[in-house]
């Protein structure tokens, strides 16, 4: 081993040490076995080469689904079982029929009283908004006509004259 430190000589040493990693960087003085560097040539094409074992590598996929290995199928659709379902089983739900949206509400060739009774059953007797069969204008006319019939007893002669125009 070569030593640059000499206590008896007070001259400055003119030797330059080798940079780290160059030549022999062994500080203990023994020779290191030379092994070739294992660098993958990323520019080499392997289109026609035989596939290597992908199962040998332990590649964990990064990102949202990182808890399975690349090449494995992702674990989707696993049913989570809560304690209520585990203890008591699945709840039984009554089957409700879906509404037929294509069914027409216009009666063609049917008895109008039967249709009115059917509508009364389906609406539970409530008429809100446009679902009622009688419009507000026609109901006000019919109610005023009924009021005339009921109140015609006291002044029937005056009304008849006013209606016929004979009083003038």
Swiss-Prot record:
Keyword Phosphoprotein (UniProt):
yes
User: What is one Pfam family matched by this protein?
Assistant: JUPITER
The record's subcellular location field reads: Nucleus; Cytoplasm; Cytoplasm, Cytoskeleton; Cytoplasm, Cytoskeleton, Spindle
Biased composition, Polar residues: where in the chain? 1-14, 145-155
Q: Which residues carry this modification: Phosphothreonine?
A: 35, 92, 96
GO terms of molecular function: microtubule binding; structural constituent of cytoskeleton
The protein's superkingdom reads Eukaryota
Biased composition range(s): Low complexity:
131-144
Q: Which UniProt keywords apply?
A: Cytoplasm, Cytoskeleton, Microtubule, Nucleus, Phosphoprotein
**Keyword Zinc-finger (UniProt):** no
This entry carries the following GO cellular component terms, namely: cytosol; microtubule; microtubule associated complex; nucleus; spindle
Family stated for the protein in its record: Belongs to the MAP Jupiter family.
General function of this protein: Binds to all microtubule populations.
- Give the protein's recorded name: Microtubule-associated protein Jupiter
Origin species, per record, is Drosophila simulans
Q: Which gene encodes it?
A: Jupiter
